[in-house]
């Protein structure tokens, strides 16, 4: 519709008059030249009146985070909370799960949720503030910032009398770096890892609420010590490069900056956050999941870290005036939260992505127990709540156009995206947790585990319910000297030779070799039809095909006729169709964090092609 110039002139004149009548409103320009310029811009550049087509008008409310936090807390019964309190009261504070639980209860009470716990919360907070200054081996590096987050919310909402808040703050004045923190940098080149970043943020939060005098040397030492572990992409290298701890540490610096740090190391770290933030968009799956790889993976808190990073970057780009990019980050936030909500609908709620009883600790490291890691998801969702800008629309994400990205060799990952599918390849896995090969194949809307969400090692550092385990991924195999060699084996070497993206597809060529000059070449082609894999060898070629067999509660339906291997699970079907050769059951079972997988093999002389698809069940 054509906009009449005299209507725009009238609009500007009325606004100018309104500005003169309202001294609280900044005056709008109302010169004739400005009016003509505006009319010209309106008629000749109509895009200024519209959102980008990739941006939805849907806004995400901050209250969504509070609702998710409340749902997470519901995994703890009142009896469980009381028991936890009594244990800490009797035995002293020994870890940070209890302060995290306390802080999140306080935040929810401040928002009018779980007020039934108000009296018990006072006892819990009293115990936290009493115990924290007494210990240096209770992971105070993690806890203090979270206790302060709760105090800020309680103070803001006037949930308790000021005297009560000041009493809790007063207890935190007794904290000293030397007596209360165990791991921190004493010099810029100290060889300490992410605990130093946690200590940095906890101390900064003490400065923020004025219970400690600012010590910028301490803060700068922590920031400098962590910088030595940043790769060329701005990603943080914790020991053995676990994917989630890259996000954890970046998130801690985002908190530091959100609360005002602009010291010596701000610019370099902020640039790293910006650079890695863009790459995080490439690593997040179509299911909303963070990349697999290394320790602490496949827990619900993983996507909490992704959400806070995406919220931080969304706000950054909104400030820069790039609403398209800001909305893309918001779209990724929305997707990560959808993934958390999916798992929170499961009963009973678990902190790890499987359905095994909590008591088994299936899929968990020794340190990753329920009491600590369930509430951790809420802790970092609260940080995302702090960063959330409700005015940014949630953007539509493009999962159809082909895209590829390869990390630095420190993280040894290749990512493919096309046709609503997503694939992740680990070409030099950490065998404490993973195996090399294609460790993830997802389709948007489908369960992440139906094909594969993570690979598995033969000697996992997390609990499984089997004495003997087999390393597996979707990986090439080779028949050599009378035996099958697996690309998931520790001795296998994978090399990414090339990868490329086209309009609606993504592809890669990867070689796999073993000692003794055994070698295969494998081509991967991802499109709306799924993933096509072609293996070429100078002898019999194979491809390992994991079939999801048990999630801790449900046993998917598996069928194999030699040409088609199908897995039916949660109203979806994963199909492996062999173009040439035969699919055999190896008789082996593999165990990853998500559950059990029966291992099949596609076989053929010299060359084979398998087409993998994930489709709704008819």
Outline where the language-model segments fall.
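Extended ligand-binding groove/face enriched in aromatic
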Residues: 79-221
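Extracellular polysaccharide-recognition and catalytic grooves
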Residues: 138, 144-150, 170-404
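Extended polysaccharide-engagement surfaces of secreted carbohydrate-active enzymes
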Residues: 282-575, 581-586
